[in-house]
């Protein structure tokens, strides 16, 4: 009888310990969740839907970029498509800026690619140096890089690969050295880096990625602003 009572007592202790461990684990996860950073509401936005205007005034660093009509475009009938397949990276930079702090978002549709099927946001682009956040339909990761005559990964998060042929969204907010990035509305990357201070924003693909882009929105604080 005493043995049975001790057994029940041990079981109760085990259950309470498990509940306590779960509670501590949950609190740790809650505390670890990053606070989302934002630009002040007064910072204006410029959105590119490629309907009334093309890419006049944009800077093509590399790639074959053109505005095309596409069924199912998020806004209207036209999108910006990158079709070069033999470059290491393909970059186009929008006219606004340069900016220090930015909030940049876009929609992208990975159309095809055997080596890569990616879409990304370039920011703080100056003299060929930049940051980029990208998603790849062929890989289960969402990554943040800096580029300066080569690439170096700064941060990575495991994600469900964005589906080929479907529209997805990417957003980046950079305040000082603090960078956060979202894929399809979920915050995955939270990182700090002091390398690049300011520059313009744009779009990015890699290798043989054929990718469509739409609804590029840039909010930025100018140098000295």
Segments from the language model and where they lie:
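Extracellular glycan-recognition surfaces and repeat-rich motifs
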Residues: 53-79, 85-88
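Secretory/extracellular carbohydrate-interaction modules
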Residues: 84-143
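Short, solvent-exposed beta-strand-to-loop segments that form ligand-recognition rims
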Residues: 184-200
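N-terminal secretory signal peptides
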Residues: 1-10, 14-24, 31
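Ligand-recognition surfaces built from glycine- and aromatic
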Residues: 198-225
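Extracellular carbohydrate-recognition regions
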Residues: 34-61, 225
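Short, aromatic/His-centered strand-loop micro-motif at the edge of beta-sheets
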Residues: 149-169
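Short tryptophan-centered beta-strand motifs in secreted/extracellular beta-sheet-rich domains
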Residues: 106, 167-175, 179-181
């Amino acid at each position: 009888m005493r043995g049975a009572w001790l057994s029940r007592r041990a079981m109760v202790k085990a259950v309470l310990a498990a509940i306590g461990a779960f509670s501590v684990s949950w609190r740790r996860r809650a505390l670890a969740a990053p606070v989302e950073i934002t630009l002040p509401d007064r910072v204006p936005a410029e959105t590119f839907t490629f309907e009334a205007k093309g890419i006049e005034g944009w800077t093509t660093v590399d790639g074959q970029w053109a505005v095309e009509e596409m069924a199912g475009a998020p806004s209207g009938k036209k999108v910006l498509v990158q079709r070069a397949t033999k470059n290491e990276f393909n970059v186009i930079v929008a006219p606004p800026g340069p900016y220090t702090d930015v909030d940049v978002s876009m929609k992208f549709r990975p159309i095809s690619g055997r080596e890569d099927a990616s879409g990304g946001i370039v920011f703080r682009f100056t003299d060929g140096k930049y940051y980029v956040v990208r998603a790849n339909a062929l890989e289960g990761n969402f990554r943040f890089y800096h580029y300066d005559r080569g690439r170096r990964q700064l941060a990575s998060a495991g994600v469900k690969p964005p589906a080929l042929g479907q529209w997805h969204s990417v957003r980046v907010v950079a305040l000082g050295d603090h960078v956060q990035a979202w894929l399809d509305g979920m915050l995955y990357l939270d990182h700090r880096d002091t390398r690049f201070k300011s520059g313009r924003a744009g779009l990015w693909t890699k290798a043989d990625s054929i990718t469509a882009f739409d609804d590029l929105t840039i909010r930025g604080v100018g140098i000295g602003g």
